[in-house]
């Protein structure tokens, strides 16, 4: 892999390739002038997977991995739930520590709980929190194959007549199985001005600290990138909407750009 220095930052780029293994849908707002009820997201007329969708899927994979492999032995490695406490559902609140209940998540958003000496969770360290950037910049993935958006029709069955309900025909857009999306992800390895190095505690944080990196557990930078970024991104099994209807299966590969 080739590292590039940009404005006192050492950055490594990776090509992210997503291949659809099932019909695939990333939703956009409905155009009031169109008959399509659930359009596919496009940018400049090209179907895309937004960076926010990919980042959310990576975060979910990281959370699951941390909970299954580290959280019980090292509470500092428990992920947060990335939302303010007031926005958490009762079920989500049951996942955080309370009195004698340990919880699998450490609490609500790290950014919301900011303050001098507050510990930042691994997912926010990598992907950012409110008021603090992370080390990974997720790309938009653009359709890079000959496939095109196709229209899919859906309906609802009338339980009384056992026929299609009147007015229930709906049109959505999807990409077929086998389509390929590509984009370029950037990983910050070193920031000379801030004195940040990926995989090490950051030194300038008055409002946060990287407690999970200050204990006995240590990773080399290449091992850190592989375990917490590349392997987790390639472990994403599904993405997008309509998953319960057979959509969203994907295969992601990441290679040095």
Name the predicted role of every residue range:
Residues 1-157, 162-257:
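RNA-binding basic/glycine-rich loop and surface signature characteristic of RAMP-family CRISPR effectors
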